[in-house]
Amino acid sequence: MSLSLWQQCLARLQDELPATEFSMWIRPLQAELSDNTLALYAPNRFVLDWVRDKYLNNINGLLNAFCGADAPQLRFEVGTKPVTQTLKTPVHNVVAPTQTTTAQPQRVAPAARSGWDNVPAPAEPTYRSNVNVKHTFDNFVEGKSNQLARAAARQVADNPGGAYNPLFLYGGTGLGKTHLLHAVGNGIMARKPNAKVVYMHSERFVQDMVKALQNNAIEEFKRYYRSVDALLIDDIQFFANKERSQEEFFHTFNALLEGNQQIILTSDRYPKEINGVEDRLKSRFGWGLTVAIEPPELETRVAILMKKADENDIRLPGEVAFFIAKRLRSNVRELEGALNRVIANANFTGRAITIDFVREALRDLLALQEKLVTIDNIQKTVAEYYKIKIADLLSKRRSRSVARPRQMAMALAKELTNHSLPEIGDAFGGRDHTTVLHACRKIEQLREESHDIKEDFSNLIRTLSS
């Protein structure tokens, strides 16, 4: 047996797992085979525990399939694989911790370091961190919709400049991207209080560059941004059509990456879908790890409301949280705004927070939601999105070009309306409720497996909720 055994396992796991999961958890592992033991080295304890918990059976199954009774024992360790003189296979043939995507010909990947090795000597500028100390990992409510994004952000905070550089988070407004940026900043500074961590909106970068040009201070501008330890930029899509800003950020990006300085970017859309941004920048955005944050599912919305109420020392009955979460689905910001209004009304009136009270306090907001999202509206939006007719959604046609949009529309109706499964089935040509249930489960499965389906679902949710 040789290291090619692990390479065979990698090839199979890459086929079996969603691309994001493989890049985040499997690719950073290093392997060493010795004395019939396959040692897998994880970059930190978090990755080790996650892989052992989630993928141990997958890996053991592959080892047994490839080797039968001679399958090696599996051992997990934190750290990097020791290099010995007897190792015949070059180190670069083993998946390195910093390799998170297919290698780019124009970039030489930096060696894996902590992110703080060879930090430049203290520079003249006074760094404006702008990191909000209130946004931490502890008060970020985790759910299925944001689990991968939070895990990736946590690893970056623990190992800046390491495996996931750059980290690119994308999703609709109010889903927690900014919270995670601040949480990473707080995490880095908790470990290294003197770290130069800068958070900013992309428009601030543009404003600073314009000011530097006006004051003939472009060199100071470059020195400021290229000597930070971590640069966290929100809403990168606002660089669109700003050619000089893109040019300067391109060189800043390259300088930071070469110095193992961490970059985290957020956007409201997938990198390649950002219009008005140069292809060379969009390509670099995808060099590290790209993770989507989707609208929170019902259970997460309830958890967000309960946590927010607890932070305000307010007792929120579970049935009230469920009532609000069931009706307000688009994003976290909307949920928190609604709860703030309920709390304010309760404080002003001295009344208990009940479902009837919430109906009254949020009357206009709930009416607007019910008016905006109807099954008819969903059918119209889905038909336009997939360029088919509404009649096709209601028909008995079973071709994939029609069946998949129909399943998508049914899943959206279940997610965005209060209609029962039989009612949804009736609205789609008199179909049985079991057909609707199958459609919902199918779309949920495809969202895990297919980037295109995940994007379609998120885009349609955003359109219908806006």
UniProtKB/Swiss-Prot annotation:
<feature type="binding site">
    <location>
        <position position="176"/>
    </location>
    <ligand>
        <name>ATP</name>
    </ligand>
</feature>
<dbReference type="InterPro" id="IPR013159">
    <property type="entry name" value="DnaA_C"/>
</dbReference>
<protein>
    <recommendedName>
        <fullName>Chromosomal replication initiator protein DnaA</fullName>
    </recommendedName>
</protein>
<feature type="region of interest" description="Domain II">
    <location>
        <begin position="86"/>
        <end position="129"/>
    </location>
</feature>
<dbReference type="InterPro" id="IPR024633">
    <property type="entry name" value="DnaA_N_dom"/>
</dbReference>
<comment type="function">
    <text>Plays an essential role in the initiation and regulation of chromosomal replication. ATP-DnaA binds to the origin of replication (oriC) to initiate formation of the DNA replication initiation complex once per cell cycle. Binds the DnaA box (a 9 base pair repeat at the origin) and separates the double-stranded (ds)DNA. Forms a right-handed helical filament on oriC DNA; dsDNA binds to the exterior of the filament while single-stranded (ss)DNA is stabiized in the filament's interior.</text>
</comment>
<dbReference type="GO" id="GO:0006275">
    <property type="term" value="P:regulation of DNA replication"/>
</dbReference>
<keyword id="KW-0547">Nucleotide-binding</keyword>
<feature type="binding site">
    <location>
        <position position="174"/>
    </location>
    <ligand>
        <name>ATP</name>
    </ligand>
</feature>
<dbReference type="GO" id="GO:0005886">
    <property type="term" value="C:plasma membrane"/>
</dbReference>
<dbReference type="GO" id="GO:0005737">
    <property type="term" value="C:cytoplasm"/>
</dbReference>
<keyword id="KW-0235">DNA replication</keyword>
<dbReference type="InterPro" id="IPR013317">
    <property type="entry name" value="DnaA_dom"/>
</dbReference>
<feature type="region of interest" description="Domain IV, binds dsDNA">
    <location>
        <begin position="347"/>
        <end position="466"/>
    </location>
</feature>
<keyword id="KW-0446">Lipid-binding</keyword>
<dbReference type="InterPro" id="IPR027417">
    <property type="entry name" value="P-loop_NTPase"/>
</dbReference>
<feature type="binding site">
    <location>
        <position position="178"/>
    </location>
    <ligand>
        <name>ATP</name>
    </ligand>
</feature>
<dbReference type="InterPro" id="IPR020591">
    <property type="entry name" value="Chromosome_initiator_DnaA-like"/>
</dbReference>
<keyword id="KW-0067">ATP-binding</keyword>
<dbReference type="GO" id="GO:0008289">
    <property type="term" value="F:lipid binding"/>
</dbReference>
<dbReference type="InterPro" id="IPR018312">
    <property type="entry name" value="Chromosome_initiator_DnaA_CS"/>
</dbReference>
<dbReference type="InterPro" id="IPR003593">
    <property type="entry name" value="AAA+_ATPase"/>
</dbReference>
<comment type="similarity">
    <text>Belongs to the DnaA family.</text>
</comment>
<dbReference type="GO" id="GO:0006270">
    <property type="term" value="P:DNA replication initiation"/>
</dbReference>
<feature type="region of interest" description="Domain I, interacts with DnaA modulators">
    <location>
        <begin position="1"/>
        <end position="86"/>
    </location>
</feature>
<keyword id="KW-0238">DNA-binding</keyword>
<dbReference type="Pfam" id="PF08299">
    <property type="entry name" value="Bac_DnaA_C"/>
</dbReference>
<dbReference type="GO" id="GO:0005524">
    <property type="term" value="F:ATP binding"/>
</dbReference>
<dbReference type="InterPro" id="IPR001957">
    <property type="entry name" value="Chromosome_initiator_DnaA"/>
</dbReference>
<dbReference type="Pfam" id="PF11638">
    <property type="entry name" value="DnaA_N"/>
</dbReference>
<keyword id="KW-0963">Cytoplasm</keyword>
<dbReference type="InterPro" id="IPR038454">
    <property type="entry name" value="DnaA_N_sf"/>
</dbReference>
<dbReference type="GO" id="GO:0003688">
    <property type="term" value="F:DNA replication origin binding"/>
</dbReference>
<feature type="region of interest" description="Domain III, AAA+ region">
    <location>
        <begin position="130"/>
        <end position="346"/>
    </location>
</feature>
<dbReference type="Pfam" id="PF00308">
    <property type="entry name" value="Bac_DnaA"/>
</dbReference>
<dbReference type="GO" id="GO:0016887">
    <property type="term" value="F:ATP hydrolysis activity"/>
</dbReference>
<dbReference type="InterPro" id="IPR010921">
    <property type="entry name" value="Trp_repressor/repl_initiator"/>
</dbReference>
<comment type="subunit">
    <text>Oligomerizes as a right-handed, spiral filament on DNA at oriC.</text>
</comment>
<feature type="binding site">
    <location>
        <position position="177"/>
    </location>
    <ligand>
        <name>ATP</name>
    </ligand>
</feature>
